Amino acid sequence: MGKFIGHFYPGLFLFSYGLYQATVVSKGMILKGCVLYPLCSPRNKQRCSRLWKISYGGLLKIVTGSLLTFYVVLCLDSGMVLMSKQVPSRFMYPKEWQHLTMFILLTLNGCVDFMSKNVLPQRCVGLEKGTLVLIIYQLLLLMVSHAKDSEGVELHVHSLLILVVFLLLLVLTAQLWAPNMCHLQLMETFLMLMMGSWLMQAGFILYRPVSGYPWQDDDISDIMFVTTFFCWHVMIDASFLLGIYGFSSFWYHCYSPSLKLTRPKEAPYYASTPGPLYKLLQEVEQSEKEDQAL
């Protein structure tokens, strides 16, 4: 897994999931948190609403995590051996086992999202966020130990990726107390895009450099340009997020005029029949007015 495919495809998934989250968050901000369903005919309304409520993000996590898990297991000719047969025995394939753990965690996170949205009688956002925080925390620990034997360009690339994961962990932890805050959702989406795009870039830097020549660990200019590329990714991903929001806002205001902001309807007012106490008070007030008139 420590190859181009092992960095590019997980990064592609994270970037695609970040784009999906960007569309969801943009729609939520434009509609001010309203739940919107696609327009459909009355006879197909129930079927369409069920399709709309499916946790596509959870399904994407399950499918991607399962495929990557099988890839890790099958990419080794000798199989996923935990301990060597030599004396004294040693652990085998530590990085592959770390990759396997990461992808299993991704699959479990998708299962939790799907169960919360489609299996439980009521969606439990706290369960989804808590599980995601726990998984990102474990991912951070795995990545810190994953970069222990790295040096030079590879160490710098992984250090910047660890920085993004750490910031994402802080944002997700804050969302446990404020899950509906738009600013935190935007930051989560942006960091997810950063994590995916930089992981794809890491595959090109470490295994398929565009110039055709490998990066030099002892060249300070290569280290500096890694940081420069990271800053470019920050600007590009921020532009992606801004562009998705702008396009969604333009599409809503120009091409979807029928999708109005749903405001809470006022409760109907019902005139209640006066009770005996109310009638008694009216009689007392009437008698007081007559006494004052006399």
Label every PLM stretch briefly.
Residues F15, L67-C75, M143, S197-R208:
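C-terminal TM-helix exit segments that contain a strictly Trp-centered aromatic cap at the helix terminus
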Residues F15, D222-L242:
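Hydrophobic alpha-helical transmembrane segments
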Residues P10, G57, M102, L132, ...:
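Eukaryote-biased feature marking scaffold/signaling PDZ-domain proteins and nuclear chromatin regulators
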Residues Y20-G33, F240-P264:
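Transmembrane-helix exit/juxtamembrane "anchor" motif
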Residues G130-L142, V153-W177, H183-I205:
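Alpha-helical membrane segments in multi-pass integral membrane proteins
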Residues M1-G130, I136, K148-E151:
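Early transmembrane hairpin module of multi-pass membrane proteins
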Residues P209-F229:
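Short, membrane-exposed interhelical loops at transmembrane-helix boundaries
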Residues C34-Q46, C254-L294:
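Non-transmembrane, juxtamembrane loop and terminal tail segments
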